[in-house]
Amino acid sequence: MEDETELCFRSNKVTRLEMFVCTYGGKISSLACSHMELIKRLQIAEPVKALNCNFGHQCLPGYESLIKTPKKNKNMLRRPRKTEGDGTCFNSAIEASILFKDKMYKLKCFPSTGEIQVPGVIFPDFEDGKNIIQQWVEFLQHQPIEKKVQIIEFKTIMINFKFQINPVSPRVIIHLKKFAALLEQIPTPYPIREIKPPLEDSKVSAKFMVSPGKKVRINVFLKGKINILGCNTKESAETIYTFLKDLISVHWQEILCVLPVPD
């Protein structure tokens, strides 16, 4: 009787879908030079705190800790990654450290194509990502560069989302093997290419093919946390969220179990 009470019906079985981190991006007009050439032309100044490239490094006074230095290969058995220059940064890119609302962002700029990446964006409206790109362009506009730099577009590259099963008790956990079995049995909004069963009862993982060549991973954890990782649009995340929310609502009492009361 106690277990039936623990698994009673709830109208709000899951929390709302939330973005928790994003890699935001954009494109600027071509700088008509390589990263090797550009790093030699750039002169460090606000709002950029540090510049890192495989062919040069600069920083403002007080930001020396942002300068990247070569790392030693600790695993001698692993084949070393092919690098260029001093190997401290992403190949073909210049990395700029820029501050926004007390958070340091590491923007990657690929000068030959104009592509921009800003990892670690946390604002749901992408305000921080847009601001970082705008600050970078303003910085470039005051540098000795022949071409006028302009923003061509903003875009999302990768978005991670999360939500949580609303527990009726701290003793209620997800039966991960049953959850994995349901994913294999029930029609899904996107084809599932891979389901990893729980290892040591930690999580269930599955990959949805949301478009040709684009996979989105979900992780379902024992305590009810669910991550939707690697989306390039909010719409695909919402589709997967709706599917999982309905699955949980229909199979609520099947996929949950109750831990014994501690002595």
UniProtKB/Swiss-Prot annotation:
Name the UniProt record assigns to this protein: Putative TATA-binding protein pB263R
Inducers of expression: Expressed in the early phase of the viral replicative cycle.
Domain notes: Possibly contains a TATA-binding domain.
Keywords: Early protein
Function of the molecule: Putative TATA-binding protein.
Source superkingdom: Viruses
Protein family (similarity comment): Belongs to the asfivirus B263R family.
